[in-house]
Amino acid sequence: MEWETLLWGFFGVVMAVVVLGGIGAVGYMRKENGRYTAEARRWAVLGQSGQPVEAVVRNVRMHPNNMTRGGSRGQTVCALVLDVAYTDATGTARTASIPTFVEDALVPQFLAPGRIVHLRYDPSDPASVSIDRTRTPLELPRAD
């Protein structure tokens, strides 16, 4: 009888570790996804009221775990961080790191050295930037 108790105890510990690990993984994925989708939420606001500006991509970083997800039309989008340099309306040189999702087919275009991207920034908070999706698409247009 005692070996059965030990076996059930071992099984319980293993299952607890699996469940807790799964909960931790889901929490991590939600946090990371939120970090990259925050830029899209800023675009919803800055697309209407933000100041347009051109920026130069200085560096592109892929997510360390190559995070991808489904895009707005079912395509695959990849998590990237674009390190950009731009000059605001007052003439102040600024830099920003913009975590966002880019369709996998467009990723090579962002890897080109010195690529120009179009941004919108908040004039009252120039550090709050978003990619101007009307001028620098992050997803390919689909035929309807």
Residue ranges of predicted features:
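Oxidizing extracytosolic/periplasmic lumen-facing domains
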Residues: 2-144
